[in-house]
């Protein structure tokens, strides 16, 4: 039976793929668990005790905010068309005692290990922070450069009311818990699930209000908040290997369905190996805004650029600006199966053939 809608916030806790056998893998013991990825960055900012960070122009305001709240200066570096970093630009903008933040966009390596090692051995006292939100659960085969800290948002991967992680040798921040944010999100998730079962629009509207209120709480909180124990228990009970396998299966089906448009140049894959991440199928298309509007009209909610360009980064990088204007993140998460992917892809193909205009 066709669903009322597709996409949006991960809310269906029944799709979280709990462990079914005795082989439960525990969350790594060196992970510090926080309410959100933003809280993990806030904790890092306090532990690092620096004053300036250099991050890619292709990022979102939620990555900038924790450092601004901590009184840091935030600067941005350019990216190349393949989403690797412009190492010349980075070298020219880095200052002594800076923090260099980098991330693997859907599994794409931003720097060579040799470049990072050269910065570490330069005597400039640079700290390295890797954001692994896009590939936190994917197996990594490189065992080279080890950053000073790794952070990630876990809420993008499963229906988790709370979820952020930090791994670092800089110490442990003594964060307190505050369940208001997670409890609001949990209530919103439950109402969203009921809405999809009953079609009661009042439940949907109330869920939206609670998500919005929770987001406001997260943004105004300047201090790091630790993950509450009940949500840590939920996180530790999830089989992320199964979740990643489900996402990759859906990715393969989407690529198979979209292959003719990819061959014709109507759809451009942002990476040739999206399975290295599994977060979304990231594509670049013309008329992205009109295509997305028509998807929404059909109740198919695929995010646009998942990093709306921060105002502070405007004009820094033409690649970042292009991606922000043309990217569509096609959902592939574990709530759905291959039949759902067929429905989503068929609608996307139909819309693209009309240039994003309603059929």
Predicted features, each with a name:
Residues 10, 21-22, 28, 32, ...:
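PLP-dependent aminotransferase class I/II
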Residues 154-155, 161-186:
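Active-site-proximal region of nucleotide-activated glycan assembly enzymes
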Residues 129-167:
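Conserved active-site segment immediately N-terminal to the catalytic lysine
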Residues 33, 37:
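Conserved donor sugar-nucleotide recognition element shared by glycan-biosynthetic enzymes
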Residues 10-31, 42-125, 129, 136-137:
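PLP-dependent aminotransferase-like
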């Amino acid at each position: 039976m066709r669903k009322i809608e597709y996409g949006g916030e991960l809310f269906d806790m029944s799709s979280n793929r709990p462990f079914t056998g005795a082989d439960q893998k525990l969350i790594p013991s060196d992970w510090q668990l926080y309410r959100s990825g933003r809280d993990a960055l806030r904790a890092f900012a306090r532990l690092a005790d620096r004053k300036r960070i250099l991050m890619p122009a292709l990022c979102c305001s939620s990555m900038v905010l924790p450092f601004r709240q901590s009184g840091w200066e935030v600067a941005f570096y350019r990216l190349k068309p393949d989403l690797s970093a412009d190492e010349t630009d980075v070298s020219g903008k880095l200052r002594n005692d800076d923090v260099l933040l980098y991330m693997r966009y859907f599994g794409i390596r931003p720097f060579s290990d040799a470049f990072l090692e050269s910065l570490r051995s330069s005597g400039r006292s640079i700290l390295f922070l890797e954001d692994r939100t896009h590939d936190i659960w994917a197996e990594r085969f490189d065992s080279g450069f080890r950053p000073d800290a790794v952070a990630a948002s876990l809420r993008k991967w499963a229906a988790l009311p709370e979820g952020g992680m930090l791994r670092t040798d800089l110490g442990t921040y003594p964060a307190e818990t505050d369940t208001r944010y997670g409890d609001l999100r949990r209530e919103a998730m439950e109402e969203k699930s009921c809405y999809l079962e009953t079609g009661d629009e009042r439940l949907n509207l109330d869920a939206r209000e609670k998500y919005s209120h929770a987001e406001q709480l997260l943004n105004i909180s300047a201090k790091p908040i630790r993950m509450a124990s009940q949500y840590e228990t939920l996180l530790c009970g999830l089989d992320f290997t199964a979740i990643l396998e489900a996402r990759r299966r859906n990715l393969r089906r989407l690529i198979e369905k979209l292959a003719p448009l990819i061959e014709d140049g109507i759809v451009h894959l942002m990476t040739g190996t999206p399975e290295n991440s599994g977060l979304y199928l990231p594509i670049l298309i013309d008329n992205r805004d009109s295509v997305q509007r028509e998807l929404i009209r059909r109740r198919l909610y695929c995010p646009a650029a998942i990093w709306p360009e921060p105002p502070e980064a405007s004009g820094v990088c033409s690649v970042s600006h292009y991606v922000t204007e043309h990217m569509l993140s096609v959902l592939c998460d574990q709530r759905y199966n291959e039949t759902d992917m067929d429905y989503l892809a068929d609608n996307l193909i139909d819309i693209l053939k009309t240039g994003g205009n309603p059929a």
